[in-house]
Amino acid sequence: GQLLKNRHYLSHLGKRLALYSVVTDSMSCYKLSLNDELVNVDFGEIVSAVRQIKTGYTGHIDNLFRASNYLVSPLNNPSRFIQGEYFLTQAQEQVKKSVLSGVDSVFLSAYFHITGKPGTGKTLLLYDIAKTLSKNGKTVIIHCGKLSPGQYKIRNEIDNLNIVSVSELRDESFSLSDYTYILVDESHRIYTEQFDAICDSVNKNDQICIFSSDPEQVLSASETRNDIVAKIEALHLDGQFTLSEKIRTNRELHSFIMCMKDLNHRPKVPMDYSNVVLNYANTTQEAQYLLAYYRSKGFKFINYTKSNYAPSPFSAYAEDFDTHHVIGQEFDKVVMLLDSSFFYDEDGKLQGIPHPNPNYLYPNLFYQGVTRVREELALIVVNAPELFEKIASIVTPAES
């Protein structure tokens, strides 16, 4: 298994690969064949292969491995997900094993809960578990946002696996009782009545329910008030698991986002923020020009979800996605806007003015958008010099 993973990771380098394994207890030597079979070889072959290497690699090895080559998002890479062209991390594998073991050991209704911060791989893990469970019974994933084309492709091509938006629970044509397994992604976003409807069905029909959540990713005031995560944890859970290691965002971007949320945050080691570009626009028109430039370079513009009833400062910008459309998705390059709707309070925390829809919270919408990025982040600050100055102090810290 490990050699197969090594081949997967190294194949992106475009080099000829020779993959060996040595069992030190017995000094048995194996080579992974092109047919993915282990073949016995003698130790001399490995020595000979090593001697044929004329020059080693002296650069920074991390530069050879871009996250976008390895991280599969079911929503953004549905074909690779359907074909199984991905690996779970050790942490994901362990949680999956524990969940499936728990599912196997219960005969009546049961609840499981997976938590983790953005970028820890909750969505891929939940979809992978759903794909496995669908081989054993009808399975539905409830998505707490708007469905993407990738989700339609998955539900059309994987037998016994349906994906629905949480809003479809009200439809007369949809019945939760049809399913053996119910999985809820981003469950911290659902309303109390939706949560109650899911639990009622699970209890009445002896179903298995798996919730996935991140309490830090609430987008609205009502989501904060509902506190669905507390309601989940108050259930008689058959298993609760946490994903802690971040796999989507590289560590520099993660550090920058943490510093943006709180100016007092200090990374443990010096960080190179060269994959963050900060721009200033004096006017909306200048911002539009910058957006056009970044889009031409392959960046996805994530705008803030708008109110249905009142204009917002960001209504003038036509987005690729809004912050509710990107729930669960990820992109190599992201560009976002900030203006005087944002400010830092006296404690150095990023705050926002009231959104035209009082249910939405600007800092939370920003966090939802900015945590979708994998490789490069561009920020455009529009006519807000104080905000720009504070963010610039993160990108180019003063010499101590």
In which residue ranges do the predicted regions lie?
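Bilobed periplasmic-binding protein-like "clamshell/Venus-flytrap" ligand-binding domains
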Residues: K300
